[in-house]
Amino acid sequence: MKYPLKAIVAGMIITGGSGTSQATPADPEAANGPKKTKILFVVTSHDQLGNTGEKTGIWIEEFAAPYYHLADLGVEITIASPKGGQAPIDPKSELPANSTEATKRFYADEATQNRLSHTVALDKISEKDYDAVYYPGGHGPMWDLAEDPQSAALISSFYQHNKPVSFVCHAPAALKNVKDTSGEPLVKGKNVTSFTNTEEEAGGLTKEMPFLLEDMLKEKGAKYQKAADWQPFALTDGLLITGQNPASSVLVAEKLMALLTQANASK
């Protein structure tokens, strides 16, 4: 399901003469038409799968499917990462068995590939420039975004300013050190999901992970929920949206747009 974008442009005076109409905006931004919804994508910069010698990074479907779902709705997207520059892609996510319509579209889209090769460094990003944030997964976030103080501060800032924060698969690792205004874990008492222990075990990587997401979220006091392995499943709890696995990435994007549409309608 796709949710329409709604924008409200207030304070415009319409005057007419000689068969023309002119809009006089109350602010300069209105002169350029309705404000576009702006969403920040934060991706991993980490490309090493523990001590295995194998490469990791973004699971490309978790980037591509939400990216095109949102872009097709007219959303303006900025892509950032801890280090900036080239964002690594997990080579396993590029295997034919993991190909989807969204990933095929990505590999035929040189402009978006170029954007993923030139991400903005997190230290150049400000929450005030965006309406929401989305974190795609892949195993990379388990190492860098889980421990990145700039990422944690950014998530906290979005949340404190009543802006949605969304994550899929391994990306909830980025919530590991995020606190609320009282100093408690942001996920405490909230309904969340993530890549599960059994999904990690099925992939044969339990021992390679620095921690298990399901365990970490439960230890932080989250009300952890999950569906059967590999099934689409996503949860919204207030401003926090989480999805279980790659199959859940579009669900997360849909829930994110639902929150933004609701927020715009209430303005």
Model-derived features with residue positions:
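Sec/Tat signal peptide C-region and signal peptidase I cleavage site
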Residues: 20-22
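Extended, subdomain-level signal for the structured scaffold at the beginning of enzyme domains
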Residues: 24-161, 173-267
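Catalytic nucleophile serine of serine hydrolases
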Residues: 169-171
